[in-house]
UniProtKB/Swiss-Prot annotation:
It is found in: Cell inner membrane. PANTHER family: ATP SYNTHASE GAMMA CHAIN, ATP SYNTHASE SUBUNIT GAMMA, MITOCHONDRIAL. PROSITE patterns: ATPASE_GAMMA. The keyword Ribosomal protein does not apply. InterPro entries: ATP_synth_F1_ATPase_gsu, ATP_synth_F1_gsu, ATP_synth_F1_gsu_CS. This is ATP synthase gamma chain. It is a peripheral membrane protein. Disulfide bonds: none annotated.
Amino acid sequence: MAVGKEIRNQIGSIKSTQKITSAMEMVAASKMRKAQERMQATRPYAEKMRQVIGHIAKSNKDYRHPFMQEREVKRVGYIVVSSDRGLCGGLNTNAFKLLVREMREWKQQGIETDICAIGQKGASFFRNYGGNVVAAVTHLGDSPSADQLIGSVKVMLDSFVEGKIDRLFLISNEFVNTMTQSPKALQLLPLPEGDDEEIGHQWDYIYEPDSRPILDGLMPRYIESQVYQGVVENLACEQAARMIAMKSATDNAGSIIDELQLAYNKARQAAITQEISEIVSGAASVG
């Protein structure tokens, strides 16, 4: 019964793979919870930082920090956040599609794009795609720190100050819930105008000697905090997407095993029926 043996081998192989995907699902679920906690802890800081920057900027209207200066767009920069590893569904692909679409739109206007890639998948994809990757940082691990991002982010900030790029955007995945992660594009530079009502009625600070040195010191930290928030949120998205992908793979493996088991039972039944028929035929011929 060669066919039956082959099916048994297939079932054994798929069961082994199913154990691996099931284990990966549980690991991803555990990492996702930790990543969610980190994401929720950093969100208030990033939001408060945005409000503080907006308030300080409005308190000194005579001074325009370089990060707030609008100019004609001739070249743009993107910081794109991706994962270092795969097996996380379409998470990276969706973010890459968003950036590629925006790159094409800029290209139609005669505007080129510089890319800072955070994550191995993004760096590899855009280098192969032909994008101008001017900075990259990979292998951040499951607990990334802001210090790991400073070097690559500074490359883009310096490019903006020096006039090499005229706008800077961040592309990352937003954690909606465990089942849904959505890619988004956020303008970092020049700093978008804040909501007057949101900013104007919360504080009444006195700055001594003035707000300019405070703004100069906080601006780079603000951009770094926004990028770090994007990285932390993308990590939570990655683990959620991986958990869902591995659960789907485990469930699919179970369905395939059931189908193969049915095929094996049919093959075994056919073999037994054939043996009985041969025995009956042999007995009849002897009789």
